[in-house]
Amino acid sequence: KNMTPNKIKVSSLNINEKIISKSAIKVIKKLDQSGYKAFLVGGCIRDLILDIRPKDFDVATDAQPQQIKRLFRNSKLIGRRFRLVHIRYGNEIIEVATFRSSSNSSKKILRDQDGRLIRDNEYGTIEEDVLRRDFRCNAIYYDVLKKRIFDFVGSVQDIRSKKLVLIGNDIDRIREDPVRMIRAVRFSTKLGFSLSDTLRKAIFDNSNLLRNVPSARIFDEFIKLFMNGFAEKVYLQMIEFGLLKEIFPNLEKELNNN
């Protein structure tokens, strides 16, 4: 697919650049000087546009994990399947990931131990990296050095209109990784973003897919979900979408009895 990003000057978005992590900028500069492309990516940019102070700053690059590791002696490789690199500055950790493709070329579609569909996850281009991300508001890249946002899928528009939209077909993307349903609840409650009717229906109709997901992954998402500080909203939305009864079959019975 030929995808041309909309390049948006940061100055037009009223972003407070002072709150961008100096360490993340250091990492990007060093990658750039070594001949690689590197961007701030994802939730940190979404939050900057919303004028929320980001908790973490993640970097995406075309450098591969071993190449990144060689450049930063304060770094270590993390993760079995996707090797991420964590670079430590004092008590701050910058997570650096290589652009990945989710190649649909391989017909053997398997589930890994974590219940996600896996294809051969190879490294890819920035365009491929965009398409494997879940929500459009998170598929956004910031070129810190040129002060431009690369927007491939209408991310800025979604963030401004507070909409949570999956990239691609709702049902396909949920089947590919059912945990996206929990993430949809997390982002919509945390950010006050609305879900389209088709996405609401897709979640409602596919809530039973959470049964295939190992409890360790659900637990991880659950912690993030309830750490938001919007527990009541989250709880009501989880019931509305039929997600709670899939995760805690007995809990909902109890609650109905009381």
Where would I find each of the regions flagged by the language model?
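Catalytic cores of the polymerase beta-like nucleotidyltransferase superfamily
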Residues: K1-N258
